[in-house]
């Protein structure tokens, strides 16, 4: 399975610090920590790639390579998330989404195939098991909180 992890673009606002980043030789303010942690939790035999749209463009080759895409977004990334999800849907790629934006507004994203909401450390394993067995549901959620002492380290080699 080829899993493409996509982090949508932050809009250019005062709080994005976009214009100040060049002074400290950085391309983005906020690394995709959630997606890098999810990447660690995906099966080892899967091939994984990360596209952080804040530092690189999503290409047609990326979408051709992918069997599925995983999105994580904050609410401020809503516009970019909608645009990228539409593009993935048009490419015929299976879409999985989680993170703050989708946890609070998943009803607004009709093109997403599967939502892994709330704490991925809790909900992602159930989704992956169902996916392996061919019975993945549209929505996975739990009211429980993850114990951060048990959260795996992010897969930094993708960054």
Where are these regions (language model features)?
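Acidic, low-complexity intrinsically disordered segments
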Residues: 1-159
């Amino acid at each position: 399975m080829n899993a493409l992890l996509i982090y949508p673009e932050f809009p250019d606002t005062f709080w994005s610090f976009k214009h100040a980043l060049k002074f400290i030789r950085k391309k983005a303010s906020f690394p995709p920590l959630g997606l890098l942690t999810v990447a660690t939790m995906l099966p080892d035999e899967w091939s994984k790639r990360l596209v952080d749209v804040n530092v690189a463009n999503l290409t047609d080759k990326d979408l051709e390579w992918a069997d599925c895409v995983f999105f994580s977004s904050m609410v401020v990334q809503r516009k970019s998330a909608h645009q990228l999800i539409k593009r993935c849907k048009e490419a015929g790629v299976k879409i999985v989404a989680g993170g703050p934006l989708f946890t609070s507004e998943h009803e607004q994203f009709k093109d997403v195939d599967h939502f892994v909401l709330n704490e991925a450390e809790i909900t992602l394993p159930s989704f992956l098991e169902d996916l392996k067995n061919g019975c993945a549901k549209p929505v996975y959620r739990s009211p429980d909180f993850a114990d951060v002492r048990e959260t795996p380290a992010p897969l930094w080699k993708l960054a």
